């Protein structure tokens, strides 16, 4: 499991990206690169990293479910994810 501080840091980045998205788009459109540089570093969407909602694991992230592969498998086997069942052929 990821440290709580890492999860919190990622949430903080997401809030900053959302807050400055409109301003960032306007500055980009105007070509004001100095203005862009004055914005906080973490307000750039490039700095976001997908993490598992339950464990905070940064690797093996399944975008469709918002979970890491480990948690996805566990929850799917328990039948906690609607519409997902084990393949058989």
From Swiss-Prot:
Residues 32-51 are annotated as: Disordered. Signal peptide: none annotated. Transmembrane segments: none annotated. Keywords: Ribonucleoprotein, Ribosomal protein, RNA-binding, rRNA-binding. Pfam families: Ribosomal_S14. The keyword Ribosomal protein applies. GO terms for cellular component: cytoplasm; small ribosomal subunit. PROSITE patterns: RIBOSOMAL_S14 (PS00527). One of its GO terms (biological process) is translation. GO terms for molecular function: rRNA binding; structural constituent of ribosome. HAMAP family: Ribosomal_uS14_1. Binds 16S rRNA, required for the assembly of 30S particles and may also be responsible for determining the conformation of the 16S rRNA at the A site. PANTHER family: 30S RIBOSOMAL PROTEIN S14 (PTHR19836), SMALL RIBOSOMAL SUBUNIT PROTEIN US14M (PTHR19836:SF19). Part of the 30S ribosomal subunit. Contacts proteins S3 and S10. Belongs to the universal ribosomal protein uS14 family. This is Small ribosomal subunit protein uS14. The lineage of its organism: Bacteria, Pseudomonadati, Bacteroidota, Flavobacteriia, Flavobacteriales.
């Amino acid at each position: 499991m990821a440290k709580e501080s890492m999860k919190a840091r990622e949430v903080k980045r997401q809030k900053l990206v959302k807050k400055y998205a409109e301003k960032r788009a306007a500055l980009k459109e105007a070509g004001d690169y100095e203005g862009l540089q004055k914005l906080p570093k973490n307000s750039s969407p490039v700095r976001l990293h997908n993490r598992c909602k339950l464990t905070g694991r940064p690797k093996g992230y399944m975008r469709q479910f918002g979970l890491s592969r480990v948690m996805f498998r566990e929850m799917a086997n328990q039948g906690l994810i609607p519409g997902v069942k084990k393949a058989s052929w």
